[in-house]
């Protein structure tokens, strides 16, 4: 059986990913929306994406950023950072539009709750 290595294709693919991340990290801060979520994500298994505050569009519904970074914080440190293109996050959030909760100070922020496990359901997210 002949073994052929596709290292050159893998290398090119990997470098493409490196370039995309490098471009993102060098992006203008106004192009990136960053939200930090404390232990709540760990307790519930959901991330909360803000869409309204005091009845007005906010968060995902108001952002002009190209990218959304959702930091999952636990026990005084960042556990991980989830990076999304804003249009992709809007597409995901729309699936859960009926799963909202009022949270924050005086319960003034309306958030869409997205189950973390659903973010990684490749069959659901990627059309093969």
Residue positions per predicted region:
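Catalytic cores of nucleic-acid endonucleases
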Residues: 5-8, 36-81
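Nuclease catalytic cores
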Residues: 10-22
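Non-catalytic C-terminal interaction segments of nucleic acid-processing enzymes
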Residues: 3-12, 73-128
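Acidic-residue sensor for enzyme active/binding pockets
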Residues: 18, 33, 50
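Short, solvent-exposed coil/turn segments at beta-strand boundaries
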Residues: 26-29, 64-67, 85-89
